[in-house]
Amino acid sequence: MFFKRLVAAGAALVVLAAAPATSQTRPPVRTDHHVHVHAPAIREILTAYCDSPGRISACDPAFVKPLTAKDLLADMDQTGVQTAWIMSTAYLAESPMMVPPLADAADRVHVANAFTVAIAAAHPERLVAFISVNPLAPEALAEIEAWKGEPFAKGLKLHLTNSGVDLRDPGQVRRLAAVFDAASDAGLTIMIHMRTRASDYGAQDVRVFVEQVLPHARGVPVVIAHSGGWGGLDANTWDALEAFRQSLATDHKRFPNLYFDLAQVFDADTPPGDRERLVDLMRRIGVDRFVPGSDWPFSGPLDAYLNDAMALLPLTSDEAEALRLRQVELKTGA
């Protein structure tokens, strides 16, 4: 009888050893590379922005919630996320979607950026601030220059959809390249939501970006938000990711500081076939180029995204652990 109990106990241990990693055994997410907290200067305009005739779609209810850094940190603590990159949403003030345009847009951008930097300064061990601009705004370069040397301003967030950037307009491409130059000069890591409003956005836009804009980042890291899309895995996102794969295929060491975040790219309902296809592309591009990101609060609770949904990706245990621990190294100064 005693022998039978030993055999049964041994079998149970084997089953436990073979089981997937649980929240108790998997490492915490070291960095969520993509979160937001609206500044008061932006919250004041959200109703007008969401009701604007210039909007191309309705605002997500989570977009207008008056959440604070305290809410973010509480969710990070609950989920086990150690640090987060907090993206300023100052660019909303200068969005062409805001109709009529704001008379105080440029001032509002600076105030909103200052708010984001102040949050990071108040929580330097947990939060990293990214200022933001509309790259087509006349004041964009001056706003970037204003934060040069500020120790708590570590990055620049660009949102091409919201800013109305057209990667097929040579003049706008040159202005975007100039913004990359300015960010590089200021030592700011760049986070770019590069999907545009073009209904056929995809490979042709990626090729323009890779050849005419990305080289202007020079040594600073560039993170492609939403893995080249704007959330989800539609035909445009697949086309963009495949174009990035092709651009890196001949020389994997090309653009060593290029990364892709996984913010809202998948969720618990993503079909298994799409998850498999995504992981296949991640491996062909280089799994080490992909980093955790949530798009909080638009992703919902961090635990559901970074723990539950991300665990459904068919990565090997080593790949999954490395992804959770991966953190893009920020520049330490201009």
Placement of each model-derived feature along the sequence:
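Active-site gating/metal-coordination segments in enzymes
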Residues: 92-198, 204
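Bacterial N-terminal signal peptides that target proteins for export
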Residues: 1-10
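Divalent metal-dependent hydrolysis catalytic cores, especially in the metallo-beta-lactamase
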Residues: 51-67, 71-99, 126-132, 154-155, ...
